Every structure is written in C-alpha cells, then in structure tokens.
Curated annotation (Swiss-Prot):
Subunit description: Homodimer. Interacts with RavA.
Subcellular location: Cytoplasm
Predominant place of localization: cytoplasm
Function: Component of the RavA-ViaA chaperone complex, which may act on the membrane to optimize the function of some of the respiratory chains. ViaA stimulates the ATPase activity of RavA.
InterPro entries: Uncharacterised_CoxE, Uncharacterised_ViaA, VWF_A, vWFA_dom_sf
Record's protein name: Regulatory protein ViaA
Matching CDD domains: VWA_YIEM_type
Xref: PANTHER family: PROTEIN VIAA
Gene: viaA
Source organism: Salmonella schwarzengrund (strain CVM19633)
C-alpha cells in the first residue's frame, strides 16, 4: 500500500510548507486571537505546544494511505517513464483506457493531446509525461490539503475545548507562566463542563477567603533561601577618612555648632553652672549643637578598624513536593470541609507555580490518594473535591502513610501538611519517634493546619509549625468584619 509520504517523496511535493501554512491559519483564527487577548499567560503555553502539533500533522501525513485509484495511476506513470517513444506509442491505448477507467483528471487532456497530433514525436512524448506528472502533483497536493484541513478542524475543536477549560481554571490555578503551562498540559484530558465546574466553585470560595489563600502561600513558600553568615570568618581591615578639628591653636574664623568642649564659647559654658539649664546643656552636647569657635582649616585622618568578613554563604533551602493529609471525619464536615478542600486547591496552585508535586491523602478509616500535579491532575482534583467528609478519625494511619511515602527517593525533601481539627486520640509512641527521626536526620518538615482552636496539644506538639485557621463562627465573623 502506497503511503502519502512516499508519494510526496516520489513527486517532490513539500508538505512542510503546507503544515506551516495550516499552523499559521490556526493561530490566526478569531477564537485563538480572542483567547490570547483574554488570557495572555496561556498564550505562551499554547505557543510551546506548536512543535507537538507540527509533529502530529507530519505523522498524520506520513501514515495516510493513498487511494487505490491514485496509487494505480502513479504506478502506471512510473512504468511509462521507463518506456522509449516507440514502446510508449504501443502502450498508449492501454494508458488512455486506464486513465479513463480511473476517472483521472488528466484523462481528458491526455486524449486531447493524442488526437490533436497525428504524429507522436519524442517531444510530444516528453510533454505528455510532464503534464501527467503535473496532474499527479496537483492530486497529491489536494490530498495533502484535504487531510490537513480535516486535522485542522479536529485540532481546532480540541484546542477550543482545552481553551475553555484552561480559561475557566486560569484564575484559580495559574499564578505564573509556569503554572499556566502545566495547566494547559493537564487540560488535554477528556473532561466535561460539569466536571471542572467543581474546581471553579471552590476557586470562588477560596477567593472569598483571602486569609486561607494567604495561609497556603505562606506555608507553601515558607522554605525560602536565606543567607547564613560564614563561620570563623577572617578579619579584614577597613579604612575610612575622618574629619576632625585641628588640635593645635589656629586662627579663629567664625562660630559653628559642635560638641568640642575645648572650643566652647563662654555663654555656653556659663549655662553649665545654672541648675535649671544643666540638662539643656547636656542635650545640646549630645546633639552637637553647642556654639564653639571654628578654627581656620580642618584636619583629616585615616581611621583603621577591623571587622569580620561580611561575605555570606547562601543556604538554598530545598523546596520539595507536598504530601497533604486531610482529615475526613464527621467533625470536619460543613464549613471545615469547604476550607480544607479550598486549602488543598491553593496548595495545588503553589505547586504548579513552583514546579512541585502535590500529593493528597484522605484519612478516616482508610487512606485514599490523589496526585494533583500529574498529567491527570485536573481529573484527580475533581475526584478529591467530590469526596464527602463523613468517616472516623485515624490520624495514626495518616502519619504511617506519610512515613511510608517519605521512604522513597523522590520524596526525600517532601513537606508534610496535615489538615485537621486535631480532635482525636493520641499518637502511638512509635509514630512519634519515627516522625522525630525524619525531622532530625532528613530535615523533613511537618506542618499542621488547625481548623479548630480545640485541637489536642499532645498531638500537635510534634509539628514543626502550626498554621491556625479557626473556622468557628466568632472567627469567621471577625475575618469578615476586618475585610
């Protein structure tokens, strides 16, 4: 079976130009122009996808098969090229019959060339083959364009669906260009409008709770790079020029304000002997506002001091993945559930912006896992947001799942985040011991996001940092009032 790629090679038809024209026409379509104006961050993400589009189009052209009629005509043309003029004249009736049977666009022109010339010369033989080849090139080009047009319609349909999805989720999940690119990659999945509206809903809830978003950003970016003074830093010599009054008597050329007691004017010195003005004298002395004689000329000297070298080493703090455990017990239902889900969505936003992983585990009696930053992150986020918090509380299982996950090499610098009201039983000693070991030896950090002011101190004591977001009615009213 003859492929279109082989036919293009045989007839020297360049598909590259046609592919580029199709890509340019796609980018110039009104739908994309309006989308790029509305969401400029996603423009770079879509543009970065162009090489993949080109490769997909080339692959489609390469794998496409030529229709049997065109393939038969091409094979006949190739065989005819090998014939001499006398041999071609002998085969001409069969060639004309073949072109007529295949309904070739060249059939009528070939018949006209033959009938209008009584003598079939070598020049006519060459002209016949040239026009035949030109007809085949036109047919091959038309076939390429038809396939590209079909692909363009399909590609435009897919891009429009992804643009709709990405445009809806961009305000919630795309903080920067990196996040926009990852969001565009995730949008390649098969999603319906009703599915991702759940993310939009929680995004709107998150926007209405700016303190929750701020808390997520503080937690997510709490491991910033910091400068650490170099230990045992050597001393370095530091030289400065200091201006001082001349120490030898010189010609007086005026009065100035200073703290030079040796050059005090008599009226200033007299105030020192008056009890009521003594403190005023000392104040002016400290502020260098006493009236003194100004000598002609000033003396400069070089002051030499030593101080530690101020160079610092930058201790870049690793920023690894998030392992987020969410309490799905009955006490976490209602507003707590909304806040916990919205907080995870905010952490997903931070993870996409900083190119980090975000792994969610739900704990009640069983542990359910979701990865929100993978290629199927949007589907995973929708499944997570669809969960209902109606189970029991088994925080020990949560910590054991975190500990198990942190044993893997790809999670060696992960941060653990536990979202709960921490109204639960105490942790077993072996779990507390293992968490402490991970904190000491591997610098893993454990964060608690407390949704209640009544969490048990015995449980929360093991965390490196406790982020409080009280969901009680009083705190909610206070936050609303402050806005």
């Amino acid at each position: 079976m003859l492929t279109l790629d082989t036919l293009n090679t045989m007839l020297a038809v360049s598909e590259e130009g046609m592919v580029e024209e199709m890509i340019l026409a796609l980018l110039a379509s009104p739908q994309l122009v309006i989308f790029f104006e509305k969401f400029p961050r996603l423009k770079n993400a879509v543009t970065a996808d162009l090489p993949r589009w080109r490769e997909a189009l080339r692959s489609r052209l390469k794998d496409a098969h030529v229709p049997p009629e065109l393939m038969e005509e091409v094979m006949c043309y190739q065989q005819s090229q090998l014939l001499s003029t006398p041999q071609f004249i002998v085969q001409l009736p069969q060639i004309l019959a073949l072109l007529h049977r295949l309904h070739s666009p060249y059939a009528a022109q070939a018949k006209q060339l033959t009938e209008s010339n009584s003598t079939f010369t070598p020049a006519l033989h060459t002209l016949f083959l040239q026009r035949w080849r030109l007809s085949l090139v036109v047919q091959a080009t038309t076939l390429n364009q038809q396939l590209l047009e079909e692909e363009r319609e399909q590609l435009l349909s897919d891009v429009q669906e992804r643009m709709t999805l990405s445009g809806q989720l961009e305000p919630t999940l795309a903080e920067n260009d990196n996040a926009a690119g990852r969001l565009w990659d995730m949008s390649a999945g098969q999603l319906k409008r009703g599915d991702y509206q759940l993310i939009v809903k929680y995004g709107e809830f998150l926007a209405a709770q700016p303190e929750l978003m701020q808390l997520a950003e503080q937690l997510g970016r709490s491991r910033e790079a910091k400068s650490v003074p170099k230990k045992d830093a050597p001393m370095e010599t530091f030289r400065t020029l200091v201006r001082e009054p001349a120490t030898v008597p010189e010609q007086v050329d005026g009065i100035q304000q200073s703290d030079d007691i040796l050059r005090l004017l008599p009226p200033e010195l007299a105030t020192l002997g008056i009890t009521e003005l003594e403190y005023e004298f000392y104040r002016r002395l400290v502020e260098k506002q006493l009236l003194t004689y100004r000598l002609h000329g000033e003396a400069w000297r070089e002051k030499v001091t030593e101080r530690p070298v101020v160079h610092q080493d930058v201790d870049e703090q690793p920023r690894g993945p998030f392992i987020v455990c969410v309490d799905t017990s009955g006490s976490m239902g209602g507003f707590n559930e909304q806040c916990a889900k919205a907080f995870c969505l905010a952490l997903m936003r931070v993870a996409l912006a900083d190119n980090r992983r975000c792994f969610i585990m739900l704990f009640s009696t069983d542990v359910v896992r979701y990865e929100l930053s993978g290629p199927e992150g949007i589907e995973q986020a929708i499944r997570f947001l669809s969960q209902r918090f109606r189970g029991g509380t088994d925080i020990a299982s949560c910590f054991r799942a975190i500990i198990e996950r942190m044993q893997g090499r790809e999670w060696f610098d992960a941060d653990a985040v536990v979202i709960s009201d921490f109204i639960a039983q105490r942790l077993p000693d072996d779990v507390v011991s293992k968490v402490g070991e991970l904190q000491r030896l591997h610098q893993h950090r454990f964060h608690a996001v407390a949704m209640s002011a009544h969490g048990k101190p015995g449980i929360m004591r093991i965390f490196d940092h406790i982020w409080r977001f009280d969901t009680g009615m009083r705190s909610r009213l206070l936050r609303r009032w402050r806005r």
